[in-house]
Amino acid sequence: MDLMQKYNRDGQTVVYNTYQMYLKESTATLESHLRMAQEGKFSLGVKLVRGAYINSDPRHLIHDTKEDTDRAFNNAAVMLATQHIDNPSAPKIGLVLASHNKESTEMMRELRQEQLRRGLPLADVVYAQLMGMADELSMSLTQKVPDLEEENNHVFKYVVWGTTQECMMYLLRRAEENRDAVERSSVSKQALWEELRGRLTLPSLLDRRGS
């Protein structure tokens, strides 16, 4: 927070904090940091994630259910994307919505489309996924949605950099996380077929696949 107060000035968001919303204390921590940013008149940089250390963090610190984590993540995302509308003195926010969850990213996109339709100012929000994971989600975020006002969605892919020794713990976590990716396989497969159909402009591709 000291670095944010020093460098996140004049509307610039340079320094970000990561908030792991599977931790029970993260909602209160985020609210506290918002107050600090408002009082200190600096921008708050937020990278919002569900969490990556569930096998090593003490269990009592983590939400009891996945639904509780989902709720905490989504509520925090909505709060950060709307707090400037009702509170003119609210601090500027730079939000990185770092998620592989389709429901959460669609929720944010729909919220921002509604804000555009109503002529409301938008918070600074970008999306991020890990390189090699949830690529179909990254692609969908850059595509236009029919009958909706459009914004320029900025999507980032996070790439690990360093020697094998330096990155070993990171790589082990990603290997563990990839086990959960199997649960998304059917969704990913459908998304990739739809992307292929769109690029080749073959409306009957999926129909032929099912025959």
Report residues per predicted region.
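Positively charged, amphipathic and often flexible ligand-engagement surfaces
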Residues: 1-211
